């Protein structure tokens, strides 16, 4: 049975941890889905896989293209798609149009927006009222890299309280889940205990209701990993060796036999 947003909320109540990873193409999405991943995020982190330095340059059209491929490979997991930078911040109508295109054109079940400041809370409220499921995202928000950098957020009492307040406001706005990125574990635990919707941590400790990582980090494909990522295998080295072996056999006329 396909995973739903309401099912994720039920899993929080039952104490079942939610498994989430990113995907940007059909093959990886198919593998993740078959392996039992609950939530697949078509993240704007795809920008880095496309050679950009940050997530900011990626466009809505690029996200639509890749999200379609991901959805074609998924049968069970809930698919959530990031709205890229400046496709939802200008106005509520812009946000509704961007999010609506994601759901209509890709087959994804939800969108994710960064930030919990008042204007964003209002935008998310309107999206939910329009029937669009929304996942929130607080803490380190990569689309604000030029304002906040990539350092851990919520380390002071003031910033921790702000992030907690944002999470509460997002729940009240109607999000079905919230990503907590690169914040102290005790703050993530406090937010998780306060909310009735599931929290998905990335660099936020073990007390969240689920965890998400960038799949290229997990597989060892990334040139650099964030400090909170865990590399489970080194596919970069495996692929390099396989290509070198193939090239050697072609040059030595050993392939094809």
Curated annotation (Swiss-Prot):
The protein, known as: 3-methyl-2-oxobutanoate hydroxymethyltransferase
Purpose: Catalyzes the reversible reaction in which hydroxymethyl group from 5,10-methylenetetrahydrofolate is transferred onto alpha-ketoisovalerate to form ketopantoate.
Cofactor stoichiometry and binding remark: Binds 1 Mg(2+) ion per subunit.
Keyword Metal-binding (UniProt): yes
GO annotation terms (biological process): pantothenate biosynthetic process
Pathway assignment: Cofactor biosynthesis; (R)-pantothenate biosynthesis; (R)-pantoate from 3-methyl-2-oxobutanoate: step 1/2
Quaternary structure (record): Homodecamer; pentamer of dimers.
Gene expressing this chain: panB
Active site: 181 (proton acceptor)
One Pfam family of this chain: Pantoate_transf
